[in-house]
């Protein structure tokens, strides 16, 4: 299993309950593929470095997990089709 880190930005107008639901949804997506989530940290609302689709701030969330490559591919697919996600990036951490 490899170590992965994903940072994603949720639209600022999303309600707090839905933010929590999205965090749990993405956590369960990787856990269903046999991954172990080692860290899930909500950074809160922050200003973006540059405007994305007329959005100037977003809710940042950081998640670290240990998984096989299939889990990160599935998470990437799910995040791409979710309209509440402004941006996301999944990186494989060095050994």
UniProtKB/Swiss-Prot annotation:
Similarity comment: family membership: Belongs to the bacterial ribosomal protein bS6 family.
PROSITE patterns from the UniProt entry: RIBOSOMAL_S6
Record bears the keyword Calcium: no
Name of the protein described by the UniProt record: Small ribosomal subunit protein bS6
Membrane is among the record's keywords: no
Function summary: Binds together with bS18 to 16S ribosomal RNA.
UniProt-listed NCBIfam families: S6
Gene3D superfamilies xref list: 3.30.70.60
Key words of the record: Ribonucleoprotein, Ribosomal protein, RNA-binding, rRNA-binding
Biological process, per Gene Ontology: translation
One Pfam family from the record: Ribosomal_S6
GO molecular function: small ribosomal subunit rRNA binding; structural constituent of ribosome
InterPro entries xrefs: Ribosomal_bS6 (IPR000529), Ribosomal_bS6_CS (IPR020815), Ribosomal_bS6_sf (IPR035980), Ribosomal_S6_plastid/chlpt (IPR020814), Transl_elong_EF1B/ribsomal_bS6 (IPR014717)
HAMAP family on file: Ribosomal_bS6
GO annotation, cellular component aspect: cytoplasm; ribonucleoprotein complex; ribosome
């Amino acid at each position: 299993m490899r170590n992965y880190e994903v940072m994603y930005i949720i639209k600022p107008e999303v309600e707090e309950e839905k933010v929590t639901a999205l965090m749990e949804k993405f956590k369960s997506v990787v856990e269903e593929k046999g991954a172990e989530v080692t860290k899930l940290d909500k950074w809160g609302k922050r200003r973006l470095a540059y405007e994305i689709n007329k959005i100037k701030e977003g809710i940042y969330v950081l998640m670290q997990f240990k998984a096989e490559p299939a889990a990160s591919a599935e998470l990437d697919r799910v995040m791409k089709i979710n309209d509440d996600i402004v941006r996301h990036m999944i990186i494989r951490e060095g050994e």
